[in-house]
Design a protein with these regions (language model features):
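ATP-binding N-lobe of GHMP and related small-molecule kinases
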Residues: 1-91, 95, 108-115, 311-313, ...
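ATP-dependent small-molecule kinase catalytic core of the GHMP/sugar-kinase superfamily
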Residues: 2-7, 15, 21-26, 117-266, ...
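Short, basic/glycine-rich phosphate-binding loops at helix/coil junctions
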Residues: 47-49, 103, 232-238
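DPxDG-like acidic metal-binding loop motif
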Residues: 93-117, 138-149
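Claisen-condensing/thiolase-fold acyl-transfer catalytic domains that form or cleave C-C bonds
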Residues: 269
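Conserved glycine-rich beta-strand-loop-beta hairpin in the small C-terminal domain of fold type I
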Residues: 275
Length: 331
């Protein structure tokens, strides 16, 4: 029996660039893949005639939805899915996309299809990546990703560039325990209104990416990276402030960022619609020193704080099938 295990990372997205056909970068932006938190999923054919899913209540529903979508294209038998670790949804970590791509890849393997290395085909199968491609490409490649946005024509390939993040760097993740970011109908409504950034803002963000963020990663200049990331995140946040309330979506996170910046800690940026943020660190010791400055509770709101490593590879695949190499990376 084909038994497949897939372990994904999670992703940070530092804000969509809402360009136009003239400015480019429509739904482009930058983000990074993280080793933690992660999805760890096993899948094999069921011994019964119905699917069996072992996961939290919300994840069980999500997996069932993905399987329904996949079966519109793929003749998938009844399967058993066990989810052993989860990424929180609507927290800015790309949990839904990573789960969907993992289920799509595992379903193809269980159905004896080996073509799992094209992330856009997996996204189409799971009906994900409606706008951003960072989590999609990151699923297979990892790293820091520069998404140039939707191509001008359907025949063009989406341009997503990947660079390696210094392995010593870390990201401190902070999120309010009981809050979620904008999602669902509200998110679709916002983008259906054809939200467009001013040409000057698009140009400024692109310069920040090309002249500051990318060179600072490639040359491992951490201080430059953290300041550039803060500037980029603030500029994008101001564009979305009317919808989410301010540069940072959650009032407690806003207060926390003020405290951190007053202490000389730079780089705090919201991921996607939040409410979670990340703060870059140059090492595990630096990350721990940042964590030590973050209270477990602020203004009555409990904060979840974690330290995450960059993930410079794609999701990992393990299989008991002799046809697949154990520990294979989706790169």
């Amino acid at each position: 029996m084909m038994n497949v295990e897939i372990i994904t990372g999670s992703r940070l997205h530092f804000g969509l660039i809402c360009g136009t056909p003239q400015t480019g970068w429509r739904f482009g932006g930058v983000g990074v893949m993280l080793r933690q938190p992660s999805w760890r999923i096993t899948m094999h054919k069921s011994r019964t005639s119905v699917d069996q899913i072992s996961a939290s209540s919300e994840t069980t529903g999500r997996v069932a939805e993905f399987l329904q979508k996949i079966r519109m294209v793929l003749p998938l038998p009844a399967i058993e899915v066990s989810v052993k670790s989860e990424v929180p949804f609507h927290a800015g970590l790309g949990g839904g996309t990573q789960l969907g791509l993992a289920i799509a890849a595992a379903a193809k393997l269980v159905s004896h299809q080996r073509d799992i290395h094209n992330p856009f085909e997996l996204a189409e199968l799971a009906q994900r990546a409606e706008r951003s491609a960072i989590g999609t490409v990151g699923f297979c490649d990892g790293g820091f990703l520069i998404d140039h946005g939707l191509p001008d024509t359907l025949s063009e390939t989406r341009n997503v560039h990947r660079i390696v993040v210094p392995e010593a760097w870390r990201f401190v993740l902070v999120r309010p325990m009981s809050a979620q970011g904008l999602c669902g109908d509200r998110e679709r409504s916002f983008f259906n209104q054809r939200a467009i950034m001013a040409e000057s803002l698009v140009e400024s963000l692109v310069r920040q990416i090309q002249d500051c963020l990318v060179p600072s990663i490639q040359s491992e200049k951490f201080e430059s990276f953290s300041v550039s990331l803060e500037d980029y995140g603030d500029a994008v946040g101001r564009f979305y402030a009317a919808e989410q309330g301010d540069i940072f979506a959650h009032p407690v996170i806003r207060k926390l960022v003020v405290i951190l910046r007053a202490a000389g800690i730079h780089g705090a940026a919201q991921s996607s619609w939040g409410p979670g943020i990340s703060i870059p660190a140059s090492s595990i010791e630096h990350a721990q020193s940042i964590v030590d400055r973050i209270p477990p509770e602020l203004d009555g709101t409990q904060l979840r704080v974690d330290i995450a490593e960059p993930l410079n590879t794609g999701a990992s695949l393990h299989s008991e099938s002799p046809e697949m190499s154990d520990g294979q990376r989706l790169v």
